[in-house]
Swiss-Prot record:
InterPro entries: Cyt_b/b6_C (IPR005798), Cyt_b/b6_C_sf (IPR036150), Cyt_b/b6_N (IPR005797), Cytb/b6-like_sf (IPR027387), Cytochrome_b (IPR030689), Cytochrome_b_C_euk/bac (IPR048260), Cytochrome_b_N_euk/bac (IPR048259), Di-haem_cyt_TM (IPR016174). Its cofactor is heme b. This is Cytochrome b. The lineage of its organism: Eukaryota, Metazoa, Chordata, Craniata, Vertebrata. Heme 1 (or BL or b562) is low-potential and absorbs at about 562 nm, and heme 2 (or BH or b566) is high-potential and absorbs at about 566 nm. GO terms for molecular function: metal ion binding; ubiquinol-cytochrome-c reductase activity. The cytochrome bc1 complex contains 11 subunits: 3 respiratory subunits (MT-CYB, CYC1 and UQCRFS1), 2 core proteins (UQCRC1 and UQCRC2) and 6 low-molecular weight proteins (UQCRH/QCR6, UQCRB/QCR7, UQCRQ/QCR8, UQCR10/QCR9, UQCR11/QCR10 and a cleavage product of UQCRFS1). This cytochrome bc1 complex then forms a dimer. Belongs to the cytochrome b family.
Amino acid sequence: MTNIRKTHPLLKIINSSFVDLPAPSSLSSWWNFGSLLGVCLAVQILTGLFLAMHYTSDTTTAFNSVAHICRDVNYGWLLRYLHANGASMFFICLYLHIGRGLYYGSYTYSETWNIGILLLFAVMATAFMGYVLPWGQMSFWGATVITNLLSAIPYIGTDLVQWIWGGFSVDKATLTRFFAFHFLLPFIVTALVMVHLLFLHETGSNNPTGISSDSDMIPFHPYYTIKDILGLLIMLAILSALVLFSPDLLGDPDNYTPANPLNTPPHIKPEWYFLFAYANLRSIPNKLGGVLALVMSILILAIVPALHTSKQRSMMFRPLSQCLFWLLVTVLLTLTWIGGQPVENPFIIIGQVASILYFLILLILMPLTSIIENYLLKW
């Protein structure tokens, strides 16, 4: 008798995606982050759902409702800090996942890659709106500054900002709509994840060598299920340590002060995972130019496949490209650091140099290096 998992209409979809899926035999731990991101999304939706049961999206009560969750709700503090730090883990896994894609040439699966970029934007939008909800000082001023950037768009900018705000400033209408969208977007993200997986399973996974692995495949279960469980345990250990020992490590102390439109914090900055893009924004003295740099710092991922000039897919056997890749990583870390610093020397010039390097590496140096490597290999 054929196993039910292979015949049942619903189970056979799950079976072909997670059980009998043929996978390359050489996948390293860098291929764990897809499953970790799935777990992060599930954790965020579950904790968020329970938080939403106690949260009120009104400017007069939002801050107090978060305090009420932490003080009076059973394990409310745990839910709140799991949700806040879960977002940080989400972005750590997301950036490592994208870095893996860049290093091993996974971006040549253009459909999967483009859905991934859409996912990145959707998750970033969700995280930004979620940061506004506790209605602390940094929530309010972060929302004001970031939404105000849209006013740089010629002709329609001011109208667009007021339309998003629902008035002439960030107020009750803004908070209510941000809560509505913050609740809705994770489900759109879940749908996009399914499309992402659908496109991935059309082609099969890439592997560290970048060479076709059709002749050497192994079943996903038990080999990669057990490997993913190990990765999951490590991630949950890190998340638990963060939540239970140092829950405010990655947050901003200003957000423990209720929002006050009459008092601007000395240094307005977004959450750490947006700082690299924020540093790109600040490194250009012109408002519209800064906004374009901010958007392009993420949208540049969409043109990476078009700039792939190497005859090899992966960077595994390309030492010059590897050096550039790790330089790019250090530039991104530098931008993240600069984004959290005040706007004064020497931080301004460091940020500008790092921004130029960021775009230079991705747009010019990497394609040129690939051509040089082709020449050295006489290809």
